Amino acid sequence: MPELLLLNGPNLNLLGTREPGIYGSDTLADIERRLGEQCAGAGVRFSAFQTNAEHALIDRIHQAGRAGVDFILINPGAWTHTSIALRDALLGVGIPFIEIHISNVHAREPFRRQSYLADVAVGVISGLGVHGYELALQAALKRLDGSPRGQH
């Protein structure tokens, strides 16, 4: 059975209360529940992890590599624009991933327009609100389509 991991970076635990005009009113728990249900229906194992500590996210990526996780969906939050270490961790484990952003980072401050992950991601979804998570999941499920890791 394929396995998918959802990763969320700093401040995403505040979804539902943090700047709802930008990020909406859905909580991270709402998003995780919906994605988990969709994965169950598709016969895919699902797990989720959120942290405000960069080293913890990197450790979780390393663990995913050892565990044979097949695909990662990641909203790296502000680490998108700052973390070469996160990029190196994702490259190091070789798990395909899709980068997700709730807001349109290209319509915001100039410093948010640089991603250290986009060029090594399978794809990037930005600016479609929390619906972007479900779109990323649909793409990941289609890409997995029961194929073993390394054949994506």
Swiss-Prot record:
SUPFAM superfamilies: Type II 3-dehydroquinate dehydratase
Stretch forming the signal peptide: none
Keywords, ordered alphabetically: Amino-acid biosynthesis, Aromatic amino acid biosynthesis, Lyase
Record-linked CDD domains: DHQase_II
One GO MF term: 3-dehydroquinate dehydratase activity
GO biological process assignments: amino acid biosynthetic process; aromatic amino acid family biosynthetic process; chorismate biosynthetic process; quinate catabolic process
Catalytic activity: 3-dehydroquinate = 3-dehydroshikimate + H2O
Positions of the catalytic residues: Y23 (proton acceptor), H101 (proton donor)
Site positions for Transition state stabilizer: R18
Coiled coil: none
EC number: 4.2.1.10
Annotated metabolic or biological route of this protein: Metabolic intermediate biosynthesis; chorismate biosynthesis; chorismate from D-erythrose 4-phosphate and phosphoenolpyruvate: step 3/7
Main enzyme class: lyase
The keyword Lyase is assigned to this record: yes
SS bond partners: none
Binding site for substrate: N75, H81, D88, I102, S103, R112
Family as reported in the entry's similarity comment: Belongs to the type-II 3-dehydroquinase family.
Assembly behavior: Homododecamer.
UniProt xrefs under HAMAP family: AroQ
Function, as annotated: Catalyzes a trans-dehydration via an enolate intermediate.
Protein name: 3-dehydroquinate dehydratase
Organism: Alkalilimnicola ehrlichii (strain ATCC BAA-1101 / DSM 17681 / MLHE-1)
GN (gene name): aroQ
